[in-house]
Amino acid sequence: MAVNRRVPRVRDLAPLLQFNRPQFDTSKRRLGAALTIQDLRRIAKRRTPRAAFDYADGGAEDELSIARARQGFRDIEFHPTILRDVTTVCAGWNVLGQPTVLPFGIAPTGFTRLMHTEGEIAGARAAAAAGIPFSLSTLATCAIEDLVIAVPQGRKWFQLYMWRDRDRSMALVRRVAAAGFDTMLVTVDVPVAGARLRDVRNGMSIPPALTLRTVLDAMGHPRWWFDLLTTEPLAFASLDRWPGTVGEYLNTVFDPSLTFDDLAWIKSQWPGKLVVKGIQTLDDARAVVDRGVDGIVLSNHGGRQLDRAPVPFHLLPHVARELGKHTEILVDTGIMSGADIVAAIALGARCTLIGRAYLYGLMAGGEAGVNRAIEILQTGVIRTMRLLGVTCLEELSPRHVTQLRRLGPIGAPT
């Protein structure tokens, strides 16, 4: 049968002609085009020198730990429920005694101004605006007091590495308490630094050195270098200056003799919530909870310490079944989407922590980039909850998620 054709009329075309107002702000246009955290990663890689990008992006040795952690979140199957009214969805609840708008917070990251000159202040501002906690690292490039002055609002946590000099460690704890931080994350998975081979190959130093390689790299990233050279010198705000690599500094300053017995001593010195970060076995989770901490973080340090370490997401349901009624469980490593966060909550986490996802946003566009990263995750959390047929986090449960493990059946860990 022949198709009848006619000459298009202007009035027929008019409804189809839709022109968006041009966006002349290149940063807004660039960030607005990012729909996923991986999109932000691609932007970050283009805009940041290789050594700085690799410091955030890389892991230990062959980087199998981080690859397996990400695969763990890919290898899940959701089980949605249907015909539920999901007009209104609430993605917040209490975490460690205080309300949070979303079930994730910003993880502690070291040397953050290396990635973007706005550094920790950008992360804290974005977190405060979103109603989620921000964690400041012992290896921060912004002083404790300076962060509070710049961002007086919002909930702040502090991540503590124990030093060989315990008096200096406790002096730092007292500063954190005086500044109004409410939670201390004691990191326990760094007796020595992991072998971060990208940093070694890139000649990563503190502060960055102007070698032939970095000068050549600077030619492709003039804005980054301009920011570095025209702002405060890049250094660890709470530590002494050091001419070597980050790993060498860790091995010189941090205490490899920390044991379970030290937790009670730390708890006696700290008035707020105490959380132990770096739990990788069920036995260790039991031992830490028995010592009266307020929470634990299942973490392999973002795959930056022991390569081939356990996947925290795989460990989560086993720890939650046994200890979920006795402590609050947080989890990190490999989280790149709102669906990842929802899966973790369904399997027993109270909160998740984002590290690289936050840093990709920071490198892509400073504070605006962090806002965009949080927005992407928030949108994903709420969309996934609606598609699962739940209206609040309390309705999520293991029946909504099945883990499909490529390394073999998931047995009960010890």
Swiss-Prot record:
It catalyses: (S)-lactate + A = pyruvate + AH2. A 2-oxocarboxylate binds at residues 55, 161, 196, 304. This is Putative L-lactate dehydrogenase. Residues 29-406 form the FMN hydroxy acid dehydrogenase domain. Belongs to the FMN-dependent alpha-hydroxy acid dehydrogenase family. One of its GO terms (cellular component) is plasma membrane. Keywords: Flavoprotein, FMN, Oxidoreductase. GO terms for molecular function: FMN binding; oxidoreductase activity. Its cofactor is FMN. FMN binds at residues 137, 159, 187, 277, 332-336, 355-356. It comes from Mycobacterium tuberculosis (strain ATCC 25618 / H37Rv). Transmembrane segments: none annotated.
